[in-house]
Each structure stands twice: as C-alpha cells, then as structure tokens.
Amino acid sequence: MRGRTRIGKFTTCGERNPKKVARTQPTKKDLKTQNPILHSDQGWLYQMVGYQAILRENSIQQNMSRKGNYLDNNAMENFFGRLKTECYYDKRFETFKQLKKQLMSIFIITTMITFRGN
C-alpha cells in the first residue's frame, strides 16, 4: 500500500455470521475516500464468497496478508498485534459489550497518539 494508512472506521460484531459481519463494514460513502481497503487475516469468514460479494457491492477492496507474512501490510498487522496484546490477551470478559468497550478505549488512545505524532 502506498501513501498514508489510516483507520477510517472501526466496527465490531459479536457474531460470526458472514452476512451480519459484512453488513457492519463501512461503505465507501462512510469512509469518504476514493479507494477504501479492508485489511483482515485469512480467517474462514473473510474468505467466504458472500462476504466478499458484499464488500464488492460497497466498492471496498479486500486485502489479506499471506499466511505468516506480517510484512504484507506491516502497519495494520502492527496495529492488530498491539490491540490484541493490550486489550485481549490475559483478560476475561463476561459479555461482548465489555470487550467492545475495551477495544474502543484502546482505539481512541491509539488515534490520539497518531494525531499527536503527525
């Protein structure tokens, strides 16, 4: 990826239903950019034809790193690695709402640090 990488929208979904997860993804209009890219791992959900079709309908390009190769999209892999380390590993959540609150708190902190650094 060339140019600046930024997170245009951050969403969460408490289910592993491909259609519901795909519907939580931002649209091109939401992102206010010409060429939005969604970065994900190679999980089964992201490889499903229905999920990929919904992304195409919304003009969102899907980007997946090759298995075991974090260098394909170092910026996003680094972000997700940090996110998991700081708010997921070694923690227990009773509800999805608690996990979502933790994710949003780290997202806000990361965004503030990024803007201060620019």
From Swiss-Prot:
The entry lists its GO molecular-function terms as: DNA binding
> What Gene Ontology terms for biological process does this UniProt record contain?
DNA integration; DNA recombination; transposition
The record's listing under InterPro entries reads:
Integrase_cat-core, RNaseH-like_sf, Transposase_IS3/IS150/IS904
Organism domain of life: Bacteria
Q: Mention any Pfam family matching this sequence.
A: rve_2
Alphabetical keyword list:
DNA recombination, DNA-binding, Transposable element, Transposition
What family is it from?
Answer: Belongs to the transposase IS3/IS150/IS904 family.
Protein name from the UniProt record: Uncharacterized transposase-like protein HI_0493
Query: Mind giving the lineage of the organism this protein is from?
Result: Bacteria, Pseudomonadati, Pseudomonadota, Gammaproteobacteria, Pasteurellales
